């Protein structure tokens, strides 16, 4: 089932004549009006923003779900405990069904802790003193069938609650914040196409925060899924972009801003736990910010490479995956004996299509199929070397050899001359070479430069 479109919800005030040893229920002067305010228009006393149930559902679903609220006449019972499976509650539910409602919420007085909902059923129960998050969670249980995904007794991997997705997901801690991208997708509030599926070794992604309206704009994704089978990782951006992700008078909002990474550990479409594992295992109790990274026990690295007011950029690297054809690898060498290994992927693909590649200083030079000379900047960090500067407008594919040293580019022309070009790294044509070798340079087996020296291997 899914909460899509507008659902008719009956809110039934329930007064208990027996509450001992708890204090007696005190009926508010305008109980019906108070319920309707909580359902449809409930300005926060601190911020003034609407934190009603309807505002939350519309925001969390990006307008896919809505509700029509009706407050029914008060019901009176002469007992303290009211359970959803009690005979009179089931009879009440049937009367609401007969009137065309999609769900009914029994609204009680007294202290918090009454919140419950029939997963995929019809009835929810909560009290007036419970916060928006509880009202939303219990009705989401009813109308989506989705379960609680918090840590529970008997789970083997909660680590004292540190790994609980907690206040990053409404369906874990009922704090009135947005659900994760995983949960939104499960209840059809987020299209699967909004979540990128990472394949191969390395890839970069621009994240659109989960709390903003979905789907994301072109070029961005709501989350990245890493892995095709359970368990798999998810990475998403969280920012305090609205009244539900931000703190309010009564609820804390999300714990931190940045990128969170969590492991999905259940195949159940409605989030039920399996094998005594928490459904969502949080790898980042504090969200990652620019420059920070996390590495999973399966050698999946997620690095935040940049931030902006409307999201984050991340780099995902599966360090156990083979390198992809056409990637550019960067190896470090400190000059000591041993194998130069553990390369960094600095070009994600397409580098095999160039007709020539060489490096000088902190620049990488490439000759494309049109004979242009491209200059790329590289600081040696993981990421995609991109956005080249065209420093040679054409004809560079005609040289017999190309190499660089410092800020000089050397080329051997068809006549065997060695030409020296200057490059400041700025856009423009590298031209007006100096002839530094008058002939015979095409006869060498290899040519390269280091510092202010040129080296040649004779045949």
Regions found by a protein language model. Name each.
Residues 320-459:
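Trp/Gly-enriched beta-strand/coil motifs that build multi-repeat beta-propeller-like domains
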Residues 16-19, 110-113, 149, 176-177, ...:
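Acidic glycine-/aspartate-rich tracts in secreted/extracellular proteins
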Residues 1-139, 154, 206, 211, ...:
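Zn2+-dependent metallopeptidase catalytic core
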Residues 103, 108-249:
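Extracellular hydrolytic enzyme modules, especially secreted metalloproteases
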Residues 27-53, 261-265, 332-352:
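Short, flexible N-terminal segments of the mature chain
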Residues 15-26, 46, 119-129, 206-321:
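Non-catalytic C-terminal accessory/binding modules of secreted extracellular proteins
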Residues 5, 163-165, 253-255:
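A short, structural micro-pattern
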């Amino acid at each position: 089932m899914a909460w899509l479109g507008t659902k008719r919800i009956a809110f039934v005030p329930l007064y208990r004549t027996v509450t001992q040893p708890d204090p007696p229920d005190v009926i508010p002067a305008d109980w019906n009006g108070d319920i309707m305010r909580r359902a449809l228009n409930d300005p926060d006393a601190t911020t003034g923003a609407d934190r009603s149930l309807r505002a939350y559902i519309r925001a969390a679903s990006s307008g896919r779900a809505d509700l029509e609220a009706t407050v029914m006449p008060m019901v009176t019972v002469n007992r303290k405990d009211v359970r959803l499976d009690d005979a009179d509650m089931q009879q009440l539910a049937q009367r609401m069904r007969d009137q065309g409602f999609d769900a009914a919420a029994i609204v009680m007085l007294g202290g918090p802790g009454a919140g419950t909902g029939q997963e995929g059923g019809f009835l929810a129960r909560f009290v007036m003193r419970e916060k928006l998050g509880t009202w939303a969670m219990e009705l989401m249980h009813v109308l989506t069938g989705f379960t609680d995904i918090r840590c529970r007794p008997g789970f083997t991997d909660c680590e004292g609650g540190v790994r609980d997705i907690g206040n990053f997901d409404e369906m874990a801690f009922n704090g009135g914040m947005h659900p994760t991208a995983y949960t939104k997708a499960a209840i059809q509030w987020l299209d699967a196409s909004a979540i990128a599926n990472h394949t191969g070794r390395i890839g970069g992604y621009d994240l659109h925060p989960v709390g903003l309206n979905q789907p994301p704009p072109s070029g961005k994704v709501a989350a990245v899924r890493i892995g095709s089978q359970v368990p798999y990782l998810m990475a998403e951006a969280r920012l305090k972009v609205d009244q539900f992700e931000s703190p309010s008078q009564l609820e804390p909002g999300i714990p931190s801003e940045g990128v969170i990474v969590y492991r999905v550990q259940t195949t159940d479409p409605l989030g039920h736990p399996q094998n005594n594992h928490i459904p969502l295992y949080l790898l980042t109790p504090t969200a990652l910010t620019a420059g920070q990274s996390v590495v999973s026990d399966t050698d999946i690295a997620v690095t935040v490479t940049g931030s902006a007011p409307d999201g984050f950029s991340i780099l995902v690297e599966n360090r156990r995956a083979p390198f992809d054809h056409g990637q550019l690898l960067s190896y470090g060498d400190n000059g000591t004996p041993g194998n130069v290994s553990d390369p960094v992927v600095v070009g994600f693909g397409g580098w095999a299509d160039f007709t020539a590649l060489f490096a000088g200083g902190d620049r990488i030079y490439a000759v494309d199929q049109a004979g242009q000379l491209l200059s790329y900047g590289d600081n040696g960090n993981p990421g995609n070397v991109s956005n080249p500067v065209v420093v040679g407008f054409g004809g560079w594919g005609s040289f017999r050899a190309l190499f660089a040293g410092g800020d000089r580019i050397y080329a051997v022309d068809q006549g065997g001359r060695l030409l020296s070009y200057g490059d400041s790294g700025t856009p423009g044509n590298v031209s007006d070479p100096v002839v530094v070798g008058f002939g015979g340079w095409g006869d060498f087996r290899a040519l390269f430069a280091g510092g202010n020296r040129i080296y040649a291997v004779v045949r």
